[in-house]
Amino acid sequence: MKINVHAGHNPDGKTACGAIGLIKESTENRKVKNEVISLLKTLGHTVYDCTEDNGKSKSDVLKKIVTKCNAHKVDLDVSIHFNAGGGRGTEVLIYGTNSGAYTYAKNTADAISTLGFVNRGVKNRPDLYVLKNTNAPAMLIESCFVDSAEDVNRYNYKTMAPAIVKGITGQTINNTPVQSNSIYKVQVGAFSKKENADALAKELNAKGYKTVIVSESK
């Protein structure tokens, strides 16, 4: 797939930054965005980061994001946000039920809810600038609520991002360590005189290293 991904809003501390509660939206959505992009690229997808960090106003941020998104021909635009206002859980916003993003949105909400978040489902928001003006189908993910202690205690960008990626692609990354039958040895020195080898072995033993002296023919 070819996918645009961006974190909504300016960074924290600037005009038009995101919601602030127990955590800060503009900090966390950038963490999630970076991890999502990394995972998607690992899975072989083409990804463009369309985040805007220097908008002069809310409308300027939105316009610049859409301009960046529309510069690429992609299958999907993904906008990462966090919610606020006293609720709990995750929801994904799209332009309308007939949007090409609907299935991605539903799968993403379902995937995030497996982390323990309330599933608020997919909601139509044709009034939102990004959803209305991107060329490709777009979805806006409200990951969880920044002002909900329950959500914040459950949230971790390292688990949120893989859930989003699974919702988009249906793919997961296997983090199970690969078993190896190989043994790796480290050689420190080689000497023609045994007393030199003995001296180095004694020094290493004193430092806590286990040593073995091996004799080989020249």
Regions found by a protein language model. Give the residues of each.
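A structural signal for isolated positions on well-ordered beta-strands in alpha/beta enzyme cores
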Residues: 2-4, 48, 212
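Solvent-exposed beta-strand motifs enriched in subsets of small alpha/beta binding domains
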Residues: 8, 177-218
